[in-house]
Design a protein with these regions (language model features):
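A short alpha-helix capping/helix-coil boundary motif
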Residues: 6-7, 66-67, 94-97, 128-131, ...
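Alpha-helix N-cap/helix-start motif
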Residues: 79, 109-110, 143, 177, ...
Length: 237
């Protein structure tokens, strides 16, 4: 059987198509890389992508500490993994920032953990037990089904069992949990961990890597400072 010579024109057309496809891939890929790195190089973050304005949020206060809030629950494994990053940021947090943790009450079990948070805060035993509770639940599989189980766990760790239960049942703790729930709803929180700045901006935790979340927080803090400086006519600090 004899071989037929390939049509030179067909070969040329095929090579042209392949070259066009390769060039298109390079251009599109390069453009995508440029867009993804341009934000990192400039240090800019984009509203709608990295953060958003909370629906119905009040205006950013024109003075006073800039409030940064972490919404979390001891029952959330992602919050447990995020907590070291929160602590790292807190060690160098700006002096004009007021940071707070806001436990969410997505379920009765998480409401109990929110009550425990404020009871420990009221008895000055939060620092000693905050990480212990995270580890007990997520590293050791411990369940806290009622207040007595939490009281037994924290007993002797900065607080007595009776003092903890008294604080947990107090009107002050109930008010704190109610306010935390109100703040959660006003901030449109439906997943944790979540971060808000000045009760006006929310970090898009679904699109921002956890390790970059506080970069967006710092960006928004700087943005608020700059806007305040323009309003007051002074240079931002």
């Amino acid at each position: 059987m004899t071989k037929t010579r390939p049509d030179k024109r067909l070969i040329t057309v095929r090579r042209g198509i392949i070259a066009f496809v390769v060039l298109t891939v390079v251009i599109v890929g390069g453009y995508g890389l440029f867009r993804s790195t341009a934000i990192d190089v400039s240090g800019e973050f984009v509203e709608g992508t990295h953060y958003k304005v909370i629906d119905g949020a009040p205006p950013v206060p024109i003075s006073g500490p800039i409030r940064v809030t972490e919404f979390f629950s001891y029952g959330c494994i992602h919050c447990r993994n995020f907590d070291p990053m929160v602590n790292d940021w807190l060690r160098g947090a700006p002096k004009d920032v007021a940071f707070e943790r806001n436990p969410v009450v997505f379920s009765p079990a998480w409401e109990l953990l929110a009550q425990a948070y404020y009871a420990l805060q009221a008895t000055n035993a939060l620092a000693e037990n905050h990480d212990r509770i995270f580890k007990a639940i997520h590293d050791n599989g411990k369940q806290f089904l009622n207040a007595e189980m939490v009281a037994d766990f924290v007993n002797g760790h900065g607080v007595t069992r009776d003092a903890f239960l008294a604080a947990l049942d107090s009107p002050a703790t109930q008010r704190a949990v109610a306010e935390a729930s109100r703040h959660e709803r006003a901030s449109r929180i439906n997943s944790v961990p979540s971060l808000t700045v000045a009760d006006h901006y929310a970090i898009n935790m679904d699109s921002v890597p956890r390790k970059k979340a506080f970069d967006v927080v710092d960006f928004l803090i700087a943005k608020i400072r700059a806007e305040r400086a323009v309003t007051s006519g002074s240079a931002p600090h």
